[in-house]
């Protein structure tokens, strides 16, 4: 790999933003795009009344409900770095999509609501980041409102998540009393709601302001200085190595809604976030600077442009250089393909991409060739990157087309949304009626909404009273083993499994069939 290409790869910062719903994840994404010069004004995310919607919320249902249910990809340049942001679903029903997204990034930004602290979904996503060993940067949001005390939030981070924290800055007051943040890294105080020329006040060697300023009259100024002294003496030492290893999280305070502390966060993040790292494969570790092009598909999204009914497969480039028109092998099928139609996303615009390098995320127009988890490369034809996680669904519904004359629309919609990973598909063992599986109820709502809006197919869904899926070996697939509390079905790859009513039904099955092994996904 040439030095120029190595330099390009090193400039890539590819990260996901994770949070519990309503912590302000999409708002912070908007502000980052603002600093990247991609959008002129940040949309109000919950803008049902104003009619303004978040740049990263693609789908109609997202706009209506003010939540992200798909992961969007956005790219911009900032201070010599090429930033690739993946905005992930905050809602727990879409955790599978989020988990796959976390396989495609080199670091994560965890957004926490200062009033609520660590919430269930944050904890879940944090654990995946830890499992992958990727660095985690923490942004404690909504400091313009009353919330938990900063020291309490740090203690919660360390106790609940089991990770060292190092505050890069520290708030001076909060809510109505928020006066600014003390930036330990840049040695300045950033004022809240100040004139531009007064925004940053330099600190002296003693840690206090170089010149007397009105902010020192704030009720919370002296308290902030005392807390910083405490952190200097008794807090964790800053360690770049521990950050990269995912063992220490740099903590930033701010307010995404009022755009306070966000640019300071971005500037510091770019300094410390890792460049593209290596990926595990069946042929050993593939380094980002390997000259052969390789990548994997972590997401498929249909109908991003309803006018064109298009389907885009998102690929994380793991090594080498992508050039439009290049020939690659789809290793799952061994098929050779020409990558002629490719795109990149800049907020709500998309543009054809002619070249990209390791660390970049590009979209390939898909006519049905790709599946989530596919590897493409112009190197070894047997290369496969590690498998992407798949969850065992916990809710199941039979699904039918209301209008039998529109079966074609119905089948196309189900097939495409299943390929996208929006829902999981099962079929009854003999009659092959459709049963769909989801991790949470909202997935069914989105499925129904998209079938109607994107595929012109009205559907009927009926609960089947089964909640637990367990796979069996093909030789154990015997319909006689089905009971009122268990049902033999097959998945989309024709692998047999039983759907059980509850744990009691599983225990009963195990007692009766001790030689049959039941397995689950994640």
From Swiss-Prot:
The lineage of its organism: Bacteria, Bacillati, Bacillota, Bacilli, Bacillales. Keywords: Cytoplasm, GTP-binding, Nucleotide-binding, Protein biosynthesis. CDD domains: RF3, RF3_II, RF3_III. This is Peptide chain release factor 3. Pfam families: EF-G_D2, GTP_EFTU, RF3_C. The keyword Cytoplasm applies. It is found in: Cytoplasm. Increases the formation of ribosomal termination complexes and stimulates activities of RF-1 and RF-2. It binds guanine nucleotides and has strong preference for UGA stop codons. It may interact directly with the ribosome. The stimulation of RF-1 and RF-2 is significantly reduced by GTP and GDP, but not by GMP. GTP binds at residues 19-26, 87-91, 141-144. GO terms for biological process: regulation of translational termination. Disulfide bonds: none annotated.
